[in-house]
């Protein structure tokens, strides 16, 4: 039997498994386990699986996240908010300022607590890079900002960047009118992105407000994407389309993104909530 919790951040839903005291799923079995558990209709169903693990020494606790297809992601904005609430509410680490180890480096999470439970969190998402070799992107250009990419017989103007994981940002007039099921996977799996990429279509309502729809790498269409919201606002600031404080409307709810300057680079804070849905037991061997 495997104990788990089901959580979501703006409808981006996850199975959370506590491995802070002992390993529940062997490393070599994690991808297969994730694919099985995330399959809707046949198991719990989720956009991904989060594992809570002990820190290696640099942080308070370690965050690992796997996409529904079994691939491991570097970072996830909605996922880290769920993770932080789980860690605090279950007294695994009882700090209101968490230093969380991720594959994208240490992320600082500040928790707002009421009646002993986390109600909101603010995450320092760190700085973005537009360097194509760090996204990565298989092109000769140093950066790919507001450039055309041939996709499905049309030229799509996009900006590529990484905020610890890769994102393609496409500014459009009507985000909700985009043919996401056609363009999303075509861009995600484009040969210029050797590690695939998260895809976001962004409509600018005003310099302080956007609407965003997402096709996530390894998960498909999702209700929200925290790193994607962060990347979209940073790209908008870079292109002088947006102010440095932006409300992001997603199918699952809203996030607030505040961009800051760190030397020559742009970073951002992401603020939003996370919800505990239920606890459960998987009646299977790991």
Curated annotation (Swiss-Prot):
Active site: 76, 225
Top-level EC class: isomerase
A Pfam family that the UniProt record links to this protein: DAP_epimerase
Any Gene Ontology CC annotation: cytosol
GO biological process per UniProt: lysine biosynthetic process via diaminopimelate
Pathway(s) it belongs to: Amino-acid biosynthesis; L-lysine biosynthesis via DAP pathway; DL-2,6-diaminopimelate from LL-2,6-diaminopimelate: step 1/1
Its EC number(s): 5.1.1.7
Site annotation Could be important to modulate the pK values of the two catalytic cysteine residues: residues: 167, 216
Complex and partners: Homodimer.
The name this protein goes by in its record: Diaminopimelate epimerase
């Amino acid at each position: 039997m495997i104990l788990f919790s089901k959580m979501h951040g703006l409808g981006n839903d996850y199975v959370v498994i506590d491995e802070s005291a002992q390993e529940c799923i062997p490393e070599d079995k994690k991808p297969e386990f994730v694919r099985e558990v995330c399959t809707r209709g046949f198991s719990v169903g989720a956009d991904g699986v989060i594992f809570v693990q002990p820190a290696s020494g640099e942080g308070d606790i370690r965050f690992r996240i796997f996409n529904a297809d079994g691939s491991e992601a570097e970072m996830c904005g909605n996922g880290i908010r769920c993770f932080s609430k789980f860690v605090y509410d279950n007294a695994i680490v009882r700090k209101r300022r968490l230093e969380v180890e991720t594959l994208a480096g240490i992320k600082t999470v500040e928790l707002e607590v009421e009646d002993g439970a986390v109600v909101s969190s603010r995450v320092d998402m760190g700085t973005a890079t537009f360097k194509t070799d760090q996204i990565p992107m298989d092109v000769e250009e140093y950066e790919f900002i507001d450039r055309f990419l041939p996709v499905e017989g049309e030229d799509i103007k996009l900006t590529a960047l990484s905020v610890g994981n890769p994102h393609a940002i496409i500014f459009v007039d009507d985000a909700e009118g985009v043919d996401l099921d056609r363009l999303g996977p075509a861009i995600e799996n484009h040969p210029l992105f050797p590690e695939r990429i998260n895809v976001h279509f962004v409509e600018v309502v005003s310099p302080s407000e956007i609407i965003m729809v997402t096709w996530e790498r390894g998960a498909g269409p999702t209700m929200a994407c925290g790193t994607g919201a962060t990347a979209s606002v940073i790209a908008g600031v870079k292109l002088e389309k947006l102010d440095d404080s932006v409300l992001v409307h997603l199918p699952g709810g809203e996030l607030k993104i505040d961009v800051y300057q760190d030397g020559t680079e742009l970073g951002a804070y992401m603020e939003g909530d996370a919800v505990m849905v239920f606890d459960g037991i998987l009646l299977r061997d790991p």
